């Protein structure tokens, strides 16, 4: 994100799994633009309504991700395997050619959760990146 927007270090806040703290802070301290960027698993948790994304306090909803895969046209076997998956990385791998479409759906739902927590004065972008730092999805803003 820093390279994309040519931002100085002080323009970035690394909140880790505590995006909820950021979202609770912003209504009283509004900013014009917020980009929430992270990996697929963290943002799948946000898409599921979790504001604390730490692994000890929230889990990826494999059933919901399986339903998203079904909506994207995945076959029943892939959907069933996704619903039984041990983690988000496995589900993303099962998505195959639908990987980016699934990431876009997750990013869009995560954005809806973030917008619901804010006052509406902040434009919200959600970006999902892979382990190499490449974008899988970007929505909003």
Where do the model's predicted regions map?
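A structural signal for small-residue-enriched, beta-sheet-centric alpha/beta enzyme cores
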Residues: 1-105, 109-131
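C-terminal edge-of-domain segments
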Residues: 129, 133-141
């Amino acid at each position: 994100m820093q390279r994309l927007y040519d931002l100085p270090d002080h323009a970035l806040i690394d909140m880790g799994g505590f995006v909820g703290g950021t979202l609770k802070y912003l209504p009283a301290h509004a900013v014009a633009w917020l980009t929430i960027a992270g990996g697929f698993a963290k943002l799948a948790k946000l898409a599921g309504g979790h504001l604390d994304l730490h692994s000890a306090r929230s889990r990826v909803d494999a059933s919901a991700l399986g339903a998203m895969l079904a909506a994207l046209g995945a076959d029943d076997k892939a959907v069933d395997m996704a619903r039984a998956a041990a983690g988000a990385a496995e589900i993303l791998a099962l998505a195959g050619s639908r990987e980016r479409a699934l990431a876009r759906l997750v990013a869009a739902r995560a954005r809806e959760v973030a917008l619901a927590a804010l006052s509406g004065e902040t434009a919200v972008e959600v970006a999902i990146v892979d382990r190499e730092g490449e974008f899988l999805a970007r929505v909003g803003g």
